[in-house]
């Protein structure tokens, strides 16, 4: 309920999950880090799993020292949550949600929020990103996330070029089926 209330009152503009493996096609961690900084600045709560979380940690985004990167309303939320949790400081700007095999925790959270609001997941202000995805398991995961109704971004062009039908299905038609779509965008900003 508190998370939902903060989204409804505009203190949090939405929730983004960043996940995925590192890719040798881009500078290590930079897609995750650049995107996370932009999201935080715009008062979007960021959850991270797996290599994305580790990359953000390497750049200091999972501790209180990164609070200067956070928008005003999200900063207030993190400070309030930190006090409520008995910490002497704000909650970290990015919340670590576990290893890559724990991505389902984010789906459980999305489902619980949708159930609480008596709506479908695709109506929630949620997005997922595998900005540096590199292995086939990432494709299986992001297709599962899209099937739940969560629009998903990938930052490395996938090997989908064999069929215009498949490309159209993934980037356009899925929205008619699941309420969400696949966004392919290499620039993390």
Question: What do the PLM-derived regions correspond to, one by one?
Answer:
Residues 1-189:
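Anaerobic metallocofactor- and corrinoid-dependent redox/one-carbon enzyme cores
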């Amino acid at each position: 309920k508190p998370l939902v209330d903060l989204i409804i009152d505009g203190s949090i503009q939405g929730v983004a999950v960043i996940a995925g493996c590192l890719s040798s096609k881009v500078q290590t961690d930079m897609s995750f880090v650049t995107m996370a900084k932009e999201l935080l600045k715009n008062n979007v709560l960021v959850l991270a799993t797996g290599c994305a979380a580790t990359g953000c940690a390497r750049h200091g985004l999972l501790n209180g020292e990164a609070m200067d990167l956070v928008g005003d309303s999200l900063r207030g939320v993190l400070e309030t949550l930190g006090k409520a949790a008995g910490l002497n400081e704000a909650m970290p700007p990015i919340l670590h949600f576990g290893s890559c095999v724990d991505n389902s925790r984010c789906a459980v959270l999305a489902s619980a929020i949708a159930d609480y609001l008596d709506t479908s997941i695709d109506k929630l202000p949620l997005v997922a990103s595998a900005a540096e995805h590199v292995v086939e398991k990432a494709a299986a995961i992001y297709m599962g996330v899209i099937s739940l109704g969560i629009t998903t971004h990938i930052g490395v062009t996938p090997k989908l070029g064999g069929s215009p039908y498949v490309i159209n299905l993934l980037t356009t038609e899925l929205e008619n089926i699941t309420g969400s779509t696949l966004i392919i965008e290499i620039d993390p900003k």
